[in-house]
Amino acid sequence: MEVEKPVYDFEGIEFCQTHPVFDGARWRMVRNHTAVLNKDPLILVDIPNANVHQRWMNGVGKCGLAIANGLPVQQELYSLFVRESAGKTCKDSFLLYIMKNTSRMIQSKNLAPRTTPVSISARVSYYAAFGILPDRQIAIEEHYKNFHLLRLDVTPISHAQVGTVRAGHSIPSFEH
């Protein structure tokens, strides 16, 4: 059995790669900042063309917005995915396919994807949970507002060949 070091701040608790974050109205278990950045842009299904890629971005973005609305950094990252989907929507059957065996699918069930203003309380709590200062959170969000993901023009493409960001670039994590 592994025994972890004690924590003295509520946000320091880690359970299943999540930390509690107060969003200004309630406490929520929020996925680790680094896990979101490392896992969510990763495509694990075959993407045969640009249309499917845009639908994939829409599905990831909408699931993310359903569970991360009002949260620093993460809300803007998922908004980027939805924005870059160019209006292509993700049908429920495809959403089930791309989110199979993920906790995100369960967490986002019956939740509407939306954006809400990020409160000061959420920024402070996110800092306590993940160590990213509020001014840095805002800088990351501004970067995501102006960032563009790769639009695939080639066909076919498989998950073995995929990168969701522009060639030679990656989604910055802005780690502390």
Model segments located where?
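Active-site and adjacent loop segments of nucleotide-processing enzymes
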Residues: Y8-H176
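A generic structural motif
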Residues: M1-D9
